[in-house]
């Protein structure tokens, strides 16, 4: 499966970033990452894993987007 690019239109629409520590968004709270998001569908995937928001793409476990939901 292909990794999601930050330049992908869907990624840009949800302000996805590979590295949550670089996020400058008012909704972001420290500690939120794809790995601890409910939408990250394989919590055992510690580097890159699937996300239900971006079908067919892998997101960084350390990433973040505006669709983040607590696991």
Curated annotation (Swiss-Prot):
Keywords: 4Fe-4S, Electron transport, Iron, Iron-sulfur, Metal-binding, Transport. Transmembrane segments: none annotated. [4Fe-4S] cluster binds at residues 34, 37, 51, 65. It holds the Pfam family HIPIP. The keyword Cytoplasm does not apply. One of its GO terms (molecular function) is 4 iron, 4 sulfur cluster binding. GO terms for biological process: aerobic electron transport chain. InterPro entries: High_potential_FeS_prot, HIPIP_sf. Homodimer. Belongs to the high-potential iron-sulfur protein (HiPIP) family. This is High-potential iron-sulfur protein isozyme 2. It comes from Ectothiorhodospira shaposhnikovii (Ectothiorhodospira vacuolata). The gene is hip2.
């Amino acid at each position: 499966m292909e990794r999601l690019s930050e330049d992908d239109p869907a990624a840009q629409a949800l302000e996805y970033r590979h590295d949550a520590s670089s996020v400058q968004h008012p909704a972001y709270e420290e500690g939120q990452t794809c790995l601890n998001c409910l939408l990250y569908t394989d919590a055992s995937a510690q580097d890159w894993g699937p996300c239900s928001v971006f079908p067919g793409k892998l997101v960084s476990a350390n990433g973040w987007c505006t669709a983040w939901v607590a696991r």
